[in-house]
């Protein structure tokens, strides 16, 4: 049944989201900045299918970064993905044709990257205004490394996810996911 299929897809994407920060060899960590290749791909795939699925996968991803031993500020950044994931899933629900690719997906992906970066920058600012400040150039590290890096990283992962999404037959955000 479709309920079991949806549950299985959600569980698989959550498992990927948990495992990527733990086992991915291609990662750069300079707190509060971190770049783990493909870490957003399960979130994007879930976002393409359902808001509920996206929310579950963000929780899994956040857990993965926590279990992998990343600094708390990076775990908070992972939790901030809930914002762009839910907003993106909501938009896709209303405009599923964006997943056909082309300029509409490019615009969607850039906007998601900007929203994603704003969420991560806010998570860093919240963290550093409520804890002791490290000896860093806050403007450069938070706005350039985290903000700018997140936009680029998000866009790359968005395209990877779209490529995977298109390669899997039978995935359609309007047909197989009930209760979006």
Q: Which residue stretches match the model-derived regions?
A:
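Loop-helix junctions at membrane interfaces
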Residues: 1-180
